[in-house]
């Protein structure tokens, strides 16, 4: 029979109606001769009642054979429940079954289909189709669908044009490693799966599309963590003739629309703006979490005269004050934080506690002469804990920024119901790579430099600033963008500053440089990480929880066993040969 409605949508207004439902058996309970079934579908759970006095012996026998995850079809009359279940939207009603058909049976599942399961991640991914039956996973993916629907409606209203760009593109330097695809037709040549549609969307501006968007898959072969996947989805935007402020206004409107339509939250516009240098100085991060205080304090000048060379001779001395936390952290706890500090390049972690108005701790004796000045500078009160890092400014900022976030989580200082958006602006154009031994683009080589610093492309690259902007939510980079270079000579200077010879630049980006000969308009854009955005809206800590079929931390799929080996014939067609791993040769 045709399904009347979803099981999770049956309500009191349906009492007395005969309906047909289809779904999965969640639980079966036998009580006093009656059989109760929790029928589950994507919209929720509905209680079924099979009464032996009201159904045939055949229906009763079928009901007695049901097990968890059997797929069934039932017909019956909706009735009011004697004892309502306030925990379920359908809790005021039940279905008195008159007909029952088993559409399919099921083996015992490797884990229970319920929220809060204890199965490990690889087991969940191995049986992802079962994991996705769980209500919280269904809700996460329904939320994702609502977000993309809201985004599309908003951008369509603003006359953005949805254009698909190629997945088989050219490998270019800069950024993370590419995923390469060998060409069978052009032997020895490779496509790259795009890390973003950056260049193609810029070319669409040159083509006159004016406003482009795409919700698009991107690919990066990089080390994974909780907010990264090898394939991910971004909301990609590009516009012509708009200023940095206008692009940010459009983005804020998009965020506000999504927040209202999916979470019922009215966000305050415009979002705060923080300069990159200020974000690093105050929060120790270029993606600051502003849901709590504990700002970094610069004490370099305050401690200059102390008889403690670690402080007095350090390039920078910075500190954070953990208010009222002196009793929360033992010496052993602080030793653990010291190990964290070393991971960020710090040589150690100094500390003092304020006890009865006096400084206590390993370095307190060196600070007695400046206690009053220190107390004033840090607004110290009894029971405060002060953590110091003496090192380069970069190391001090990064270390204390990491400790700031860690401590806030440990002490429960973060309001998880808050959504604090902000812009980080006025970025450096380049960042130094120790691994490469050279300056590299902080964003990408197509970012427009601020006019007043562009002359440093032939001078001190550390002084070049970019017209770039990142949007941050609760300590996560939600997205980033910039105005782009549209003048050929400036783009060539940028490539040269990055160490490209004219020949290398032409080989890698000749098509873009050529396009700049044909009236390339001023343009700029932005991309928002959809997976990360939905993760934060859903209150999850890993983007795997909002992706239908993600990879694990080894970039593999336990369900399909991808990546896998392929037949020798396929490799021969591609003129490829796999070298045996040296470790395998000795086994």
UniProtKB/Swiss-Prot annotation:
Chain residues that bind ATP: 220-222, 229, 477, 529-532
Catalysed reactions, as listed in the record: tRNA(Asp) + L-aspartate + ATP = L-aspartyl-tRNA(Asp) + AMP + diphosphate
Entries under PROSITE patterns matching the protein: AA_TRNA_LIGASE_II
Binding site for L-aspartate: 174, 220, 443, 484
Region (Aspartate): 198-201
GO MF terms, alphabetically ordered: aspartate-tRNA ligase activity; ATP binding; catalytic activity, acting on a protein; nucleic acid binding; transferase activity
Pfam families in UniProt: GAD, tRNA-synt_2, tRNA_anti-codon
Keywords: Aminoacyl-tRNA synthetase, ATP-binding, Cytoplasm, Ligase, Nucleotide-binding, Protein biosynthesis
Keyword Nucleotide-binding: yes
Compartment(s) where it occurs, according to its Swiss-Prot or TrEMBL record: Cytoplasm
GO BP, sorted A to Z: aspartyl-tRNA aminoacylation
EC number: 6.1.1.12
One of the record's GO cellular component terms: cytoplasm
Main location: cytoplasm
Family: Belongs to the class-II aminoacyl-tRNA synthetase family. Type 1 subfamily.
Role: Catalyzes the attachment of L-aspartate to tRNA(Asp) in a two-step reaction: L-aspartate is first activated by ATP to form Asp-AMP and then transferred to the acceptor end of tRNA(Asp).
Subunit and partners: Homodimer.
The protein, known as: Aspartate--tRNA ligase
Organism: Streptococcus pneumoniae (strain 70585)
Gene name of the record: aspS
